[in-house]
Amino acid sequence: PAMRKLMAHSVSIWESDPEAFSYHANGYMQISCEKMRDDVRQIHTEQAAIGYESVFIEGEEESRDYMLNLFDDWQAEGITSVLHEKPGGYANNVKAMEGLSKKVLDLGVTVVLNTEITGFETEGAGQSVTAVNTDKGTIQCDNLIVGAGPWVRDFWNMIGLPSQIDLKDLNGDLHENIDMWRFWQLEEGVLEIPPETLTTNDGKIPPVLHVDTDAPLYSTVDGSLITDQLWGIYYKPDWGFGGIQGGASPYTVDTPVNEVAIDPYGPESKEFTASKDFPEMWVSALAHCHKRFEGMMPHYHKEPSGGIGCFTPDSFPVIDTFNNNVTIIADSNHGYKMLGVGCLVAEELLGEKQELLEPFRFSRFKEGKLHPVSNSPYPWS
């Protein structure tokens, strides 16, 4: 329920200025196999309780009919529930960042780019941060807010916070010396065909589609079995990328957490880009879902893509204040969609406690107030 409420708040921020954020409010669909039916039903119940509009379809035949009503070539197997969220959607990343930049610059905020943070100056027993050291000089500060995506590990270490923690699980058992951070390799790519290839039967832009199923997945290239285990993909037509953009469930990075090289990030990394098996798996999964994608492997965009995400022990964000005046937004790879979190953090720093942020405090690990474990192959679902 906590993540549901936080996301509903962020969706309201996206909806507040769709043009500036390049936001497309087409909705979102969670299309799932039997293993996930109860979880998805619970999500629907929780959404209804907070007024977040969604439709829940149960049963294999009912789910197939619902999907065929949207896509007449729908052919995914093993689907027994569909959650169709009417709010939500996606945004064009670069344009959204440009829109955000304009908003803060118009408010008179100083934005300093291309600057490396080298350390912090602290004082007092609580190690309050009084200044930020950079390669261009020192910046004095009253409060420090860190929202740094996968680089949170490095700032966490700079501030002197523990790299391992004690954690009480949902059964009440205590686990010691658990890594605070773990990295997952993100699998993303683009099928270079006209985005209009993926429209609904009535010619409209569809919701963002997320499919999790345990039906066997066979190669669209040679018919060989790719997996008979639970697998998942998401996809959408994207005019920013010029094709069908999406990804598959990530996999864990086995490198010891403090040895993971975050830079260079994304496509420039020699170590952390989408795996060599990803393109065939993802395009085959698209073909598993829609007949229109059969034989589309030659259209896969072959340049490196993807990146890594930095996750907390329960894969949900940590948003809390440390050392008296250091607020950390550790997004646990939820970051981009959590547009409204900055607003909530700002309100807290001005003295107004935010109920929406309470379930995301660091203390939850020791207290055993963890977020639920997902049955999806996606750790952030």
Task: Report the location of each language-model feature.
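Conserved N-terminal glycine-rich FAD pyrophosphate-binding loop of Rossmann-like flavoproteins
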Residues: 1-5, 20-30
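A non-catalytic, amphipathic alpha-helix used as a structural packing/dimerization or gating element
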Residues: 2-16, 42, 46, 99, ...
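Flavin (FAD/FMN) cofactor-binding and adjacent substrate-gating region
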Residues: 15-16, 20, 24, 35-107, ...
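A short coil-to-beta-strand element that immediately follows conserved catalytic motifs
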Residues: 23-26, 112, 166-179, 291-306, ...
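Mid-domain beta-loop-alpha active-site segment that forms a flexible
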Residues: 82-103, 148-151, 277, 281-285, ...
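Flavin-dependent oxidoreductases
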Residues: 120-273, 295, 379
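C-terminal catalytic lobe of FAD-dependent flavoproteins
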Residues: 252-263, 273-381
